[in-house]
From Swiss-Prot:
This is Venom peptide Ocy7. One of its GO terms (cellular component) is extracellular region. It is found in: Secreted. It comes from the Eukaryota. The keyword Secreted applies. Keywords: Secreted. Its main location: secreted. Expressed by the venom gland.
Length: 16
């Protein structure tokens, strides 16, 4: 679950 949350945050950075 932690890994999934980290990946989601990383995706947000890429979008920004």
């Amino acid at each position: 679950a932690k890994n999934s949350a980290e990946a989601n945050e990383n995706s947000x950075d890429a979008n920004e």
